[in-house]
């Protein structure tokens, strides 16, 4: 593994342990050349996924981009990073085990919306506003009224 600080090819693993519900390995590494310390994660990749964008263009699936979309929607919200990682890992697992090598960005967006519902209502509205391309205040009102109706039906399911 190349050192991100000095570019040396010779780094050493100091510590390895399971992470994220045993779906990845967290490794602490050190560079003998510059003394830099950094962390890497190793995950199983069942298959190479391609995302079909709305324009029809195909791009490789990027797990980090999925994490960033959660982080943007949940910015300044009381949602722990660990819960985001579990949601992302679940989505990736479902995508990889679907048997498909190409998946539409719409399908991914629907899975993110579903996961966001259980994480945070505000994050859900934020993500939905981008995913569903809200342009009017009524679009927000409709989603918020759906959330309020859900809360009224089952106030403990929050």
Swiss-Prot record:
Q: Which InterPro entries match?
A: ATP-cone_dom, NrdR-like_N, RNR_NrdR-like
* Cofactor(s) essential for the protein: Zn(2+)
Query: Pfam families annotated for this entry?
Result: ATP-cone, Zn_ribbon_NrdR
Q: Which GO terms describe its molecular function?
A: ATP binding; DNA binding; zinc ion binding
Q: Which PROSITE patterns match?
A: ATP_CONE
* Keyword entries, A-Z: ATP-binding, DNA-binding, Metal-binding, Nucleotide-binding, Repressor, Transcription, Transcription regulation, Zinc, Zinc-finger
* Name under which the protein is recorded: Transcriptional repressor NrdR
- Name the species this protein comes from: Rhizobium leguminosarum bv. trifolii (strain WSM2304)
């Amino acid at each position: 593994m190349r050192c991100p600080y000095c570019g040396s090819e010779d780094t050493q693993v100091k510590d390895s342990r399971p992470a994220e519900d045993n779906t990845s390995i967290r490794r602490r590494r050190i560079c003998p050349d510059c003394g830099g310390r950094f962390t890497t994660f190793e995950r199983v990749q069942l298959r190479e996924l391609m995302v079909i964008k709305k324009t029809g263009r195909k791009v490789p699936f990027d797990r980090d981009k999925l994490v960033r979309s959660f982080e943007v929607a949940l910015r300044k919200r009381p949602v722990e990073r660990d819960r985001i990682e579990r949601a992302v890992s679940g989505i990736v697992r479902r995508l990889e085990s679907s048997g498909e090598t190409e998946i539409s960005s719409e399908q991914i967006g629907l899975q993110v919306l579903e996961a966001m519902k259980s994480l945070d209502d505000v994050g859900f509205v934020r993500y939905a506003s981008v995913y569903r391309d809200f342009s009017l205040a009524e679009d927000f009102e409709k989603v918020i009224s759906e959330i309020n109706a859900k809360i009224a039906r089952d106030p403990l399911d929050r």
